[in-house]
Each structure stands twice: as C-alpha cells, then as structure tokens.
Amino acid sequence: MFKGVYTALITPFKNRAVDYTALAKLVEQQINGGIHGLVPCGTTGESATLSHEEHKAVIRTVVELVQGRVKVLAGTGSNCTEESTELTCYAEEVGADGALLITPYYNKPTQAGLIAHYTTVANHTKLPVVLYNVPGRTAVDMHADTVIALSKVSNIVAIKEATGNMERASQIHKGAGSSMTLISGDDATFLPFLSVGGQGVISVTTNLAPRLVRDLWDLWHNGQINEAREVHEQLLEINGLLFCETSPIPVKAGAAMLGLCHNELRLPMTAMSEANQAKLHRAMVKLNLLEE
C-alpha cells in the first residue's frame, strides 16, 4: 500500500509561524521530483514543537495541496495514546491516505504497552496505520516480535524501521510476510534494506534530491543493481551530512540553500554550524543541486 519513495517533509517557518507559502512550494517541488508520497508532521517536520492546531493545519494543507496526485501519510504519533488517536482521526477526516505513528517517546512503554497503544489507535480509525521505530529518538525499541504481533491487526499495514538494522528487517519480513510492508527510515541503508524485503523509504534526503532517490528505486526495480549501487554511492556523502547534526537541522539548511524556505527552526533546535553548512553546500554542488 505504501511502497516507493516518500518524503519526510520539513515544516517551513517564517517569523516563528508556519510558512504556508513555502509549504506549497515544497509540495510542488516534491511532486515534480517524482516521489510517491509525502509525510507531513513527522520527526523531520518538527512535530514535537508544533502546536496541536498547527499540526492539524499542516496535515490539512498538505492534503489540499496534493489533490490526490501522490499519497499523504500523515504523522500522527504522540507519547499520549489519546492525543495520537485524536490526530489520527483528524487525518482521516481531512482525507489523508494513512497515518504514521512513532513509538511513544520519553515514557518508555513496555512491549505490551506498545501493542496496546497501537491497537487502540488502529481500532479508532479506518486509515491504514504505519508503525515507526526509531529508538535513537524515543528511548524505546519496538522488537521484531512486537511488530509481527501488530501485523495481525487488520489496518496496521507497514512499519518505518529506522534503525538501519538488516537483521531486524529480515526477522520482521520472515515473521509477518506480506501483511507488513517494510519501509526504510534510514537513507544511508535504503539500498541494502531493499535487498532484505524492503519496499520503500521515508526519506529525509528527498527534501533536497527527490529525483536521485527515485532513480535509485527505479533502477533497483528494473533489475539494474549495479546502476542502483552507483546512485547509492553518489548519495552517501549527503546522506551522512544530513545527520551530522540533529535532523532536521541540516536538511533545513539545505532547503534554504535551494531557496525553498527560510533556515528557521523552532527552539531547542538551532541552525547548522557554518562549518557544516559549507560541507553540505559542497556536497550539494557535487550532486548538481547547486551551482558553485
């Protein structure tokens, strides 16, 4: 259902408010770049520092801007099950195609708690639900057995697995089979992830280079493995730089270099260091995203 190249969309700000003009520009740039879907209000979209009203408005606006041209997988996760349920139901109401739910962060639920959380949200919506495991952010790791158990819930259809752990991905694929679509949440390991059963990526890099990541996907699916590896290697440097400081700090800087938005984040996020911005600029020039 959610296969291919999806962009973990940044949320542009101007003078501390959401910049809806820039958001429209970003959406068009992404669709023109060939992506299969957009993910507003995820980690890359600074969802943790959006108010609930802003969170809903961004989801609604992206759905309206897309007009069915690509899929919209709305970020609706929270560390509070009731809040996540509310956001998910709202995403369904305004026409999103699915909901992406990060594991509840900070309060560190057990595996039983994770199953209860996701099952509760899924039971309140008809939307397809995508799990999201990123323990480096949340301090809770969703085990393969937990994912396999949740695959039995009819509208829990996929997982964004952001650990970059191929063994984990293989365990999920073996245990859940076709009932759980595997989506990479780690740009640097997208290609090897495909080799163990992955069927897509939710990418940070596509904010800057959507066509290149789409090319990698197309080459892989056309059986052009060596050519796909060449694109993978072209992207290695920028994939690394986009996480050399806490994401989305670097990708916001890169988007500003492309003239897509202001280089503005919400505290406690601060702008990328000048030294790292220079490195990112050089990497973008190498990929012909920018001129010298």
Swiss-Prot record:
GO terms for cellular component: cytosol. Its EC number is 4.3.3.7. It is found in: Cytoplasm. Belongs to the DapA family. Pyruvate binds at T44, I202. Keywords: Amino-acid biosynthesis, Cytoplasm, Diaminopimelate biosynthesis, Lyase, Lysine biosynthesis, Schiff base. One of its GO terms (molecular function) is 4-hydroxy-tetrahydrodipicolinate synthase activity. InterPro entries: Aldolase_TIM, DapA, DapA-like, Schiff_base-form_aldolases_AS, Schiff_base-form_aldolases_CS. NCBIfam families: dapA (TIGR00674). It comes from Magnetococcus marinus (strain ATCC BAA-1437 / JCM 17883 / MC-1). PROSITE patterns: DHDPS_1 (PS00665), DHDPS_2 (PS00666). It is an enzyme of class 4 (lyase). The active site is at Y132 (proton donor/acceptor), K160 (schiff-base intermediate with substrate). Pathway: Amino-acid biosynthesis; L-lysine biosynthesis via DAP pathway; (S)-tetrahydrodipicolinate from L-aspartate: step 3/4. One of its GO terms (biological process) is diaminopimelate biosynthetic process. This is 4-hydroxy-tetrahydrodipicolinate synthase. The lineage of its organism: Bacteria, Pseudomonadati, Pseudomonadota, Alphaproteobacteria, Magnetococcales.
